[in-house]
Amino acid sequence: MALRLFEHNEKAYHAAVRMMEQYGKAAIVHPTGTGKSYIAFKLIEDNPEKVVIWLSPSEYIFKTQLESLKRNDPDFPLANVHFYTYAKLMCCTQAQLDDIAAQEPAYIILDEFHRAGAECWGESTVALLKLCPEAKLLGLTATNIRYLDNNRDMAEELFDSRVASDMTLGEAVVRGILPAPNYVTTVYQYQKDLARYQTRVDNLRSAGIQDVNQKYLDALRRALEQADGLDKVFAHHITNKSGKYIVFCANKEHMDEMISHVPEWFAGVNPEVVV
């Protein structure tokens, strides 16, 4: 059964094929959830006799991609596809890299190719690419910029800026490819901020200005005291008790502090939550 791509992926696929034919490399920058991996699977399907090396950050990512593929096409041809993680390449000796290159891949797929910009991973990836000069290169990522690495553009470094298709998250939402997110904002642990503002008001020299600012601060305090706490916000918006959720923290100390509040905050979602 031939793979059928969504329209946005089909256009990206054909653009990438044309670019690889012309330049030997092509990058696709599409948001997570738009089905980028199927573009690579389509390339494999259209070239069943060609050897393909697929590089990915982790075995888990590739496993979930394969599970999705097998649900759609249990008999998909993968005999000539050889999977390696970037970390695996990093641990390879020169002889082992030579053995990988000896498979003479027609295509090398760099999944999440921005990750190949990491110092150790990048060196081994570039070393393999140099050993396979005839292989065409297809890159997939949701972002080609390494923002915490001096804003390095990995599409420029690895693909000479040959980007066959570029789609922003906003575009994907507007086009109905991805669902619009539901943003919920709230405040918590505002007592320290209020105390800091109170100190600033107390230090104002003009009595008139101090009175005006004190009224604003008192109004803010009353509004915050009436606002729902995180426990009520979570209970209202988190409806899947067994769902998976990500919490972003500033550092280890911040994370430890947040963990200490989990039983309190998530009591209305799942009172049996384990920290």
Task: Walk through the language-model features, giving the residues of each.
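Hydrophobic residues on the short alpha-helix immediately C-terminal to a glycine-rich phosphate/catalytic loop
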Residues: A16, I39-N47, S124, L128
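Conserved helicase motor "Helicase C" RecA-like lobe of SF1/SF2 P-loop NTPases
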Residues: A250-V275
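Walker A/P-loop
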Residues: Q22-L43, F248
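Conserved RecA-like ASCE P-loop NTPase motor core of nucleic-acid helicases/translocases
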Residues: V51-S58, K244-N251, V274
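Interdomain helical connector at the RecA1-RecA2 junction of SF1/SF2 helicase-like NTPases
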Residues: D149-Y245
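SF2 helicase catalytic motif II
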Residues: Y86, D98-I145
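Inter-Walker segment of RecA-like/P-loop motor cores
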Residues: F62-E104
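Conserved pre-motif I regulatory segment
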Residues: M1-V29
